[in-house]
Amino acid sequence: MAAILKSHIKTNSIRIGFVPLVDCAPLILAKEEGFFEAEGLNVDLVREPGWATIRDKIVYGELEAAHALAGLCFGISLGLNVLARHCLTGFLFNANGAAITISNELIKLGVTDNQSLRNFIFSNKNKRQVTFGIPNIVSSHHFLLRQWIQPAGINPEEDVNIIVVPPQLMVSCLESGLIDGYCVGEPFNSLAVSKGAGSVVKESADLSPMHPEKALIVTKDFSDSRREEHLAIIYALIKAAKICDTEDGRSRLSTILSKPQYLGVDEVIIRKSLFTGSDGMKCDDFNVFSRFGVNAPSNSRANKVISQIRNAGLVKNLKDISINSVFREDIYLEALELSKKKQSENESSEILSMI
């Protein structure tokens, strides 16, 4: 099998959107290594400034698929701040990969964790409210920020101001004093540290280990009408994600992702989130692309996202949506089976060539 049902796949271009973050790595690698092309797919990668653009372009058919927030599948399907359309995912890009960064001004004022932040907020009542940036209301970053501040007795609705800021603008907003901190994915935590604008106070792998982060989202219409292509995309991403979790793969990714058409950030900064240690993020599993079965959109991962959406008060009634219709592990498993079959065929070919 030279490719997954290659002769039957349509030749229509497939536009896949992405936001320039380190966790889009499997998508970029699949394109750069020719994995999509090998499966007969004509994929165009479209760089977008933020999640609102990704959301709208998926809803209105300007993108066929996207690297997106895991929570956005439910957000679009529920019609949160957008026209409701049934979206789904058959592949999760990664787990973990985010952090909370605060301004060095707050650090100088003695804020180093959530408890010292609380002390500062309640001694600062007559001054301006502390403002945090998040990429989207249904992003893991919103939920992680709430999870960090609430145990310290900080009310996210009353004691701080939480606003939506596109990921690429987080650092400049921190530098200018428009926000006092943020929760976001890489490279925008490491970039703030390198610029002397802020310090990382919490990594998401510490706060909520193995939380689902990004997903490949498509509409149900796309998945139904172009199923073979959808499976082939996921197959290529599974293959790429495995490479992203190897040391050699991460070294290559640092260079590839730094290209201007992708992240456009110095590869030294990108390496800080791909290789943990004294010069980068501290958690060993800061970014997980394939290990521990993180690519499967399982019921347990779906329930985690839904629970976070509910706990944040974003929806009251979830009766109109089934988690099994949004997080489609069955589609992932079908693509995974094709991946295993392809690997077995390749191994058989290698053995025959040696005879």
Residue ranges and their predicted role:
Residues 2-157, 180-187, 197-204, 209-210, ...:
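Short, glycine-/small- and polar/acidic-enriched structural segments
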Residues 100-101, 215-218, 222-223:
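Short glycine- and hydrophobic/aromatic-rich loop-to-beta-strand nucleating segment
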Residues 210-213, 252:
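Short gly/pro-enriched beta-turn/loop segments at secondary-structure junctions
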Residues 306-355:
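Conserved C-terminal helix/tail region of periplasmic/extracytoplasmic solute-binding proteins
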